[in-house]
């Protein structure tokens, strides 16, 4: 019958095709199944931060599954890095240890090594180095053949004032082999760098009193920024040489002084103040650009010749001829030398070496009663008679210093650093 007949070739081909269609439909159903009902499939971990950046929603980070990071444990809780470590998953949350460590028999024997063998190894290690020996009974100290000098004190207990008293500032002039050469060079250069004596008469808008106010202000600037005395002397020299060639309005006189002080600071100081500091001390009267342009103009007028001999340099040489050295004499001579900077008349007509000689003699006579040394007469060629005109003018300036309108120099030398020499009473007369 038909129902019992064997299927023909056509029927088998149709059955095979139907079976293939069923398998294909089954695969499609599995692919289209709801993800919530699907079997958990292990997906590769992705960085949630990238998803947040792409979506632009900062809160999307909470909606996605954050990657699991490994918590850094303290050093004592770190797991042992051993290939024999096994972590049974059914005991991970129990009270028993989460992992067990398999120890080989050789390791057990090494752990059970008796302490005596370790002691033997330690003795062998100590015996290996001849400089190390095992602790034993202490031997008596070997007596010294010479007595130890106990007069020395520890550097930590010594008074710092003792060390400071031994320190002496180094002078570039303290080179005996070159004394004569240095002095000869300075004497030649002071003539070349000397300002014109009557230049103020050709200035249409400034006077000697304005110049005195400017120099007095520069003294305060030098004290404010802890500048060297040589810097002040150089700045005044630059100002006088510049005014000898250029006419300046009174509104620009302070700008000239500021640029001169800036140049002198760069030439003399190790750490000169910045340009902004000089703008600040003028109370922003001038801009930084104006100060720099004036600096350029001053350099051009001076032909970049900044190494001018000053009263301070000659005084430093003359101080070497004191027998004995007297700090108060040196401070008073420096005070008198700076007083000569205030008044252009009459001191512009004297060379710096002459002013320094008069200041040194007047200071020496005021403090000790001594006169111009014979050694300086031989060195400089100046006699007391040749110094007399400048000495008389400087003596009058010294007498009238308390009544002078500009008092910055007197206030400066009241300091204990200069032994308060501005408070000394000047001699009424000079026995010349």
Swiss-Prot record:
Which positions carry Phosphoserine? 5, 55
Checking InterPro entries in the record gives: Cyclin (IPR039361), Cyclin-A_N (IPR032447), Cyclin-like_dom (IPR013763), Cyclin-like_sf (IPR036915), Cyclin_A/B-like (IPR046965), Cyclin_C-dom (IPR004367), Cyclin_N (IPR006671), Cyclins_cyclin-box (IPR048258)
The Gene Ontology terms for molecular function here are: cyclin-dependent protein serine/threonine kinase regulator activity; protein domain specific binding; protein kinase binding
Q: Which PROSITE patterns match?
A: CYCLINS
Task: Explain the post-translational modification.
Answer: Polyubiquitinated via 'Lys-11'-linked ubiquitin by the anaphase-promoting complex (APC/C), leading to its degradation by the proteasome. Deubiquitinated and stabilized by USP37 enables entry into S phase. Ubiquitinated during the G1 phase by the SCF(FBXO31) complex, leading to its proteasomal degradation.
Which compartments is it annotated to reside in? Nucleus; Cytoplasm
GO BP of this protein: animal organ regeneration; cell cycle G1/S phase transition; cell division; cellular response to cocaine; cellular response to estradiol stimulus; cellular response to hypoxia; cellular response to insulin-like growth factor stimulus; cellular response to leptin stimulus
**Where is the stretch described as Disordered?**
26-45, 55-75
Q: Which Pfam families match?
A: Cyclin_C, Cyclin_N, Cyclin_N2
Q: Name one GO cellular component term.
A: cytosol
Modified residue annotations for N-acetylmethionine: 1
Q: Which UniProt keywords apply?
A: Acetylation, Cell cycle, Cell division, Cyclin, Cytoplasm, Host-virus interaction, Mitosis, Nucleus, Phosphoprotein, Ubl conjugation
Q: Which family does it belong to?
A: Belongs to the cyclin family. Cyclin AB subfamily.
The entry describes its oligomerization and partners as: Interacts with the CDK1 and CDK2 protein kinases to form serine/threonine kinase holoenzyme complexes. Interacts with CDK1 (hyperphosphorylated form in G1 and underphosphorylated forms in S and G2). Interacts with CDK2; the interaction increases from G1 to G2. Interacts (associated with CDK2 but not with CDK1) with SCAPER; regulates the activity of CCNA2/CDK2 by transiently maintaining CCNA2 in the cytoplasm. Forms a ternary complex with CDK2 and CDKN1B; CDKN1B inhibits the kinase activity of CDK2 through conformational rearrangements. Interacts with INCA1. (Microbial infection) Interacts with human cytomegalovirus protein UL32.
Q: What does this protein do?
A: Cyclin which controls both the G1/S and the G2/M transition phases of the cell cycle. Functions through the formation of specific serine/threonine protein kinase holoenzyme complexes with the cyclin-dependent protein kinases CDK1 or CDK2. The cyclin subunit confers the substrate specificity of these complexes and differentially interacts with and activates CDK1 and CDK2 throughout the cell cycle.
- Full protein name: Cyclin-A2
UniProt source species: Homo sapiens
